[in-house]
Structures are given as C-alpha cells and as structure tokens.
Amino acid sequence: MNLNATLFAQMVVFLILAWFTMKFVWPPLINALDERSKKIADGLSAAEKGKLELEAAHKRVDQELSQARNEGQQRIADAEKRAVAVADEIKAQAQAEAARIIAQAKADADQQIVKAREALRGEVAALAVKGAEQILKREVDQAAHADLLNQLKAEL
C-alpha cells in the first residue's frame, strides 16, 4: 500500500471535518433531538395526565349520577311516605266523620223513637179514655148511675 501525501491530507481534512462537525454541527442536532424527545415525552405525559383526568371525571360523573339516582329514589320514597300518611290521615278523618254521622243518626233515631213513644202514649191514653167512655155509656144506664150516686151519698 502506498501512503502518500494526499492520503494524509484527506485524513487531516477528515479529522478537521469530524472535529468541526462535533464542535459546531453535532450540538445543535443533539439539542434539536433532545428538545424533540422532551416535547414527545411532555406530550405523552400530558396525554397520560389527560387520560387520568378523564377517568377521574368519569368516576365523578358516575358518582354524581349514582348520588342523583339515590336522591331521586329517596325523594320518591319520601313522597310515597307522605302520600301514605296523607291517605291515612284522610281515612282517619273519614272514619271520624262517619262515626260522627252514625252517632248523630243514632241520636236522631233515638229522639224520634222517644217522640213516637210519647205520641203513642198520648194516643193510647186518649183511646183508653174514649174506649172507657164508650164502655161506660153502654154498660151503665141511668138507673145504675142513680143507685151508685145514692150509695155514695149514704157513705159520705
């Protein structure tokens, strides 16, 4: 192999080029690559963070929906309880009103019975007097009356 000056010159030029590249060209390339990898890493971490935030938001939404469902069910249960209480109260009022009406009707019936009895007593007494009067008119004659009156005079 023949080593001549051009080979050495090419080696020197290559070494100068390598040194120049390492000194002036390589650092900006490395910096650009580092910045690019940093941006990619930041983007990936931001994507991961966004994914975690999305999952957390989904969990919050699920919790809020669950809470809203529970509150809705609780409100429905409360409304049903109030409705039952109101219905029971209305039933109690209706029963009390029915009892009052029944008691009033019984009192009115008793009062009418008493009035009817009094009226019947009066009628029976009148009929008895009338019947006795008619019996006395038929059975007792003037001679019997005169004899009874004479007997009463004698006893007095």
Curated annotation (Swiss-Prot):
Q: Which HAMAP family match?
A: ATP_synth_b_bprime
Q: What is its main location?
A: membrane
* Membrane topology summary: Single-pass membrane protein
Which family would the database say this protein is a member of?
Belongs to the ATPase B chain family.
Q: State which residue ranges cross the membrane.
A: 7-27
On whether Nucleotide-binding is a keyword of this UniProt record, the answer is: no
Keywords annotated in UniProt: ATP synthesis, Cell inner membrane, Cell membrane, CF(0), Hydrogen ion transport, Ion transport, Membrane, Transmembrane, Transmembrane helix, Transport
Disulfide-bonded cysteine pairs: these are: none
Reported function: F(1)F(0) ATP synthase produces ATP from ADP in the presence of a proton or sodium gradient. F-type ATPases consist of two structural domains, F(1) containing the extramembraneous catalytic core and F(0) containing the membrane proton channel, linked together by a central stalk and a peripheral stalk. During catalysis, ATP synthesis in the catalytic domain of F(1) is coupled via a rotary mechanism of the central stalk subunits to proton translocation.
GO MF, one annotated term: proton-transporting ATP synthase activity, rotational mechanism
Assembly and partners are described as: F-type ATPases have 2 components, F(1) - the catalytic core - and F(0) - the membrane proton channel. F(1) has five subunits: alpha(3), beta(3), gamma(1), delta(1), epsilon(1). F(0) has three main subunits: a(1), b(2) and c(10-14). The alpha and beta chains form an alternating ring which encloses part of the gamma chain. F(1) is attached to F(0) by a central stalk formed by the gamma and epsilon chains, while a peripheral stalk is formed by the delta and b chains.
Annotated compartments? Cell inner membrane
Q: What is this protein called?
A: ATP synthase subunit b
Q: Which CDD domains match?
A: ATP-synt_Fo_b (cd06503)
User: Which is one Gene Ontology cellular component term of this protein?
Assistant: plasma membrane
Would the keyword Cell membrane be found if you checked this record's keyword annotation? yes
